[in-house]
């Protein structure tokens, strides 16, 4: 029997623990075929066996799957709602110590944005941000904390001036902000979720999952959150069956556990 996409999915799952069956089939298959051809392979079997032997090729594949589009203060109006509405709500609800989870954090732009905004209202030693991603490469970039000017273009100047040092052709985030963020490898579709979380930020990620996988992620987020905790989702997303999954909308892109 010919080696096909079904075989490829099984082998990728065994090798990486990434279950491609939980992603939208047509969309993901098309993306992988495009990458495969660009890398010079004509079929799934040759591509998989090449990845088994070449760690760099494999990491490139994982990075491509996770679709790492990230920048500081992306979608500014959402961050304004976060600062002006959600931070006071969190402070009233939980006091001065917060546990935040930035899920699928990519290169760290998002968890560092969160931390800088929280630092305007909380002591740094009261802020704990868990930041997770499936991709080792982007986690390495996040831990280093060095960014190009382009990725910082939307960040308010006051935050750039206060929390970054200009170095060469980029900017280094300061150690006091870095110390608040705990970067970890984590697969949203497979791994155990952290608990005792006051707010989860997961933006523009689950749009690539099947409806069943998406709902399961939202259920697990709900179990991770403390009572009345907040889920912050992306500009392209909406939780259709929010009440069934244990949420109510509090603002555009913000949902509260009920």
Regions found by a protein language model. Give the residues of each.
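Conserved SAM-binding loop of SAM-dependent methyltransferases across substrates and taxa
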Residues: 107-122
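Conserved class I S-adenosyl-L-methionine
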Residues: 95-108, 128-130
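Conserved AdoMet
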Residues: 2-98, 218, 234
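Residue-level signal for inorganic ion chemistry
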Residues: 82, 200, 225
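Short hydrophobic/aromatic beta-strand or adjacent loop that forms the aromatic wall/cage
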Residues: 250-254
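Extended basic-aromatic, gly/pro-enriched interface segments that bind polyanionic ligands
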Residues: 126-201, 205-213, 238-240, 258
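Conserved beta-strand signature within the Rossmann-like core of class I S-adenosyl-L-methionine
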Residues: 228-235
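A short glycine-rich, Lys/Arg-flanked "PGG" loop and its adjoining helix->strand segment in the class I
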Residues: 215-227
